[in-house]
Amino acid sequence: MENNAPRRVDRRTAYTKNTVKDAMLELLAEMPFEKITVAALCRRADIVRTTFYLHYDSLTDVIKELADDAVLAASGTGSKNIKDLSILAREMNKSTDPELLAPYMSLLPVCQRVADDPKYKVMFRDTMVSDYILMQIYRSQKSDSIRQFQDHLGISGQQAEKLFLFVITGAFEVNKSMGWEKKQDWYEVQKVLLTFISGGYEKLEQYFAK
């Protein structure tokens, strides 16, 4: 009889991989990714090279898995509805006080919230590593976002894909330029950007509804 029960997670494997990923985050806080070596990572994780290569083919694989983890953590909370950006824009036009806006921060898309987790923040300060995160956000959010753009705006799949690419890369680069810190000037900038984006959505809806 075939056993269709899910396979039990190998705890030793999970522990080892988490140890390697934590060691990578520690090293990223000390040096650029391009200067990190397998030997240095193994020393920090207290494992031998054979163990490392049992789980990963390269250092890049560790980064990609960390990027997956960061995006997954951000995707588990908050809104996925593009309409909610209009709500946030309205609130920001009332006030840019961080305390007053705190209840609405979950309305931000993943590309805006992904660096909020202190555990992964160090990854965003390395240009090479942050590019992997952007690619992972794009891959993980692409299908759902394109569908929403098509449903709400009545545009083609190609138009929806390019609009999503424009929004996500723009938001990501603005956050990168501001050091991924949500200080007062970040709220002022976001007020302008979200008002611009939500206004564009509304105009597109009106245009294609004709």
Predicted regions and their residues:
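Alpha-helical bundle regulatory/interaction domains
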Residues: 1-30, 35-40, 44, 48-210
